[in-house]
Amino acid sequence: MPKNMETLQRSYMGPSTPNHNLFNNATELPDDLNFSTMDVPYDGSMPMNMSSDSLMNLLEDRSKKLACAVDTELARESTASEFVAGFSADSPQAQLAETGAETGAAGGSKRKASEVDSDSDSDDSSKGKKLVNKPKIRQRYKKATIQNRTSLTEERQYSTEICTVAAPDQIAKYFAQDFSAHLNEVKSECQMSANRFSDYISETGYYVFVVKKGDRKPFEVVFAKFVNNATNEYTNNYYMVDNRVFVVSLNNVKFMVSYKLVREQGIDIPPHVNLCNDAQAERTPLNCYFEPVKNAFQATLINHFHLDMFYAQTTFVTLMQAVGENKTNMLLNKLYQMYQDRSLFTLPIMLSRKEPVNENAPQNKNHAFSYVAQIMKYSKNLRFPQGDPTQQVMDRLEEIVTQKSSLTYKYSSVANLLFNRYGRRDNNADALKKVKKEDGNRLLVEQYMSYNENDDTSHNFIVLQFGGVNDERLTIAKRGKEFYWIAGEIKDISVDDLIKKYARNVHHVFRIINVNRRESTTWHNNLLKLLQLLLQNLIRLEDVQRYSDKSDTKFVYKKV
């Protein structure tokens, strides 16, 4: 029984955004995260001096009031929706839009997607364009993009193998549990909770939290608001906290983490993070700069600031409210039973295996992946052509790197690029056509590096793809004692951690930044062409550094 039935009743009758103070209290973490509350009785769950009959009468009275209030609200919303739908269908604007859509279809004209899918709220944006009354389901990923920069003056799949940790009969028994016998007793409430649950699942807004430096604690996590645009909310109301922000997105919860706080906490910030420098941030205090984080850095922020706890509490509160009181009671009882018998930590049941299967792992240091063995065998007597830096190439560097070419990410195509002299067809890489590329994984990278780290004379390279359709790419080229890395964001491995393992060698790292998947593929090919010039000594490292410092380039260069 909730402590405050009036508050619960208002939550069903009010707007979708929860009360700020109530939500802060509901998502507040205890000071000691290791303190166990399972054995502590909850004294505030019911009045201590009430008799059983009085308690039942109170429950019945409050339940009737709640049911009446919910029915009234649902009826009001249903009436309003029907009125709006009828008005829209009969309005001249809707008929005009429908006629315009039919005319456009008959004429076979094409329009850019941006004209139809524009999210702009400005009245001027619709002038001169046809309005199309086209029902469309807006998928969440379209709204998940984080703007790199906003201004206060302007704003007011991964291919995996699935493994299980429980026997199939246990899994089937868990998922086949029948709740109907219990739920039929409260059928009317189940229908209302189903409506709430459907609205909850289809909601596309975000719960926004701000992670900032605390007055009495090292940091604090504050609930901001339930909004459709997290960056606008932060820019309008929290820009004074810090105008440089790391954005941690966990489904429909977004954490806006202060850049200054991360730096003060001594957390290592990856070198490819592309937030503005201190001088620019101070010079433009009304501009907010946002950097979405993922993979290893995201895991670090989640662990350090306990964001997983805030996400779990937020999800529990909103989900339990959506399914209703009776269903919540059954679910919590079931969860507590599973916690008691420890089955909660072996179910459910399906885990994504990020590492290669065991049979692909090398059994000892003398075992080699077929891919690595072929590279070492067929590149044994090959060397990258060597020339002299020329002013003509330096002056045309950007043009050479960004011009279209027939280069693909096949091993033979990259081999022809790197081992044939620039501007010629020498057929130096014919032997490498026999190399069969394999899918990338961490063990394969480590084995390639281990075979090459103590060889000071060989020239070779490896190309790897991770993540199936996501097409995350990694290229490593070796010339003598030096390694050249081309990479973007790779979910399965950390390039920086790998480089630290091979400190004996010199590493040149080209990190692709601030691009989508398609641009990442294009820029990876561009950097391969840049690497050709560098390996063949046609340009100097100073030229590479100067090119990477340009404002419109999509990569950063670092020597380790």
UniProtKB/Swiss-Prot annotation:
Keywords: Early protein, Transcription, Transcription regulation. GO terms for biological process: viral genome replication. It comes from the Viruses. InterPro entries: TATR. The keyword Transcription regulation applies. Residues 1-25, 99-134 are annotated as: Disordered. Belongs to the nucleopolyhedrovirus IE-1 protein family. Regulatory transcriptional protein, which trans-activates gene expression from early baculovirus promoters. Can also trans-activate its own promoter, suggesting that it is autoregulated during normal infection of insect cells. This is Trans-activating transcriptional regulatory protein. It comes from Orgyia pseudotsugata multicapsid polyhedrosis virus (OpMNPV). The gene is IE1.
